[in-house]
């Protein structure tokens, strides 16, 4: 076994090395500008991917009726603009009214509109 004197010397030497290096948890070498830019870009990329994943998760349950409207033929000349169907926007007052309706009422209203607009 090691003697107490040798153990004490080793402890003093290790303490002196740790005390005089004075790293304070910082890296010993400074990072280069390219390394900092790479880390910044990686952080931005991770943040963007997290936002896209969150948005994709929120949009999974959203139903878009625009795809159904694009497949239908236009009924009026005013609906045709340079060969394309003009998209109808949902105004804020219509949106508030739609939110207040129950899902069953929305399904019935959607089916009524769908059957009325077919040629």
From Swiss-Prot:
Signal sequence interval, chain numbering: 1-25
CC per GO annotation: extracellular space
Keywords annotated in UniProt: Cleavage on pair of basic residues, Hormone, Secreted, Signal
Record localization: Secreted
Cleaved propeptide residues: 26-31
Pfam families to which the protein is assigned, alphabetical: Parathyroid (PF01279)
GO biological process: adenylate cyclase-activating G protein-coupled receptor signaling pathway; bone mineralization; cell-cell signaling; homeostasis of number of cells within a tissue; intracellular calcium ion homeostasis; magnesium ion homeostasis; negative regulation of apoptotic process in bone marrow cell; negative regulation of gene expression
SMART domains tied to this protein: PTH (SM00087)
InterPro entries (UniProt xref): PTH (IPR003625), PTH/PTH-rel (IPR001415)
MF terms (GO), sorted A to Z: hormone activity; parathyroid hormone receptor binding; peptide hormone receptor binding; type 1 parathyroid hormone receptor binding
Subunit structure: Interacts with PTH1R (via N-terminal extracellular domain).
Record's function text: Parathyroid hormone elevates calcium level by dissolving the salts in bone and preventing their renal excretion. Acts by binding to its receptor, PTH1R, activating G protein-coupled receptor signaling. Stimulates [1-14C]-2-deoxy-D-glucose (2DG) transport and glycogen synthesis in osteoblastic cells.
Family: Belongs to the parathyroid hormone family.
The protein's name: Parathyroid hormone
UniProt source species: Gallus gallus
Highest classification ranks of the organism: Eukaryota, Metazoa, Chordata, Craniata, Vertebrata
Chain's gene name: PTH
């Amino acid at each position: 076994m090691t003697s107490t004197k040798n153990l004490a010397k080793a402890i003093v030497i290790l303490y002196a090395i740790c005390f005089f290096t004075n790293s304070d948890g910082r890296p010993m070498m400074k990072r280069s500008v390219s390394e900092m830019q790479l880390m910044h870009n990686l952080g931005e990329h991770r943040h963007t991917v997290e936002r896209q994943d969150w948005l994709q998760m929120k949009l999974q349950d959203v139903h878009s009726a625009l795809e159904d409207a694009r497949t239908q033929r236009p009924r009026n000349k005013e609906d045709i603009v340079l060969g394309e169907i003009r998209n109808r926007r949902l105004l804020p007052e219509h949106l508030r009214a739609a939110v207040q309706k129950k899902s069953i009422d929305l399904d019935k209203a959607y089916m009524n509109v769908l059957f009325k607009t077919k040629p």
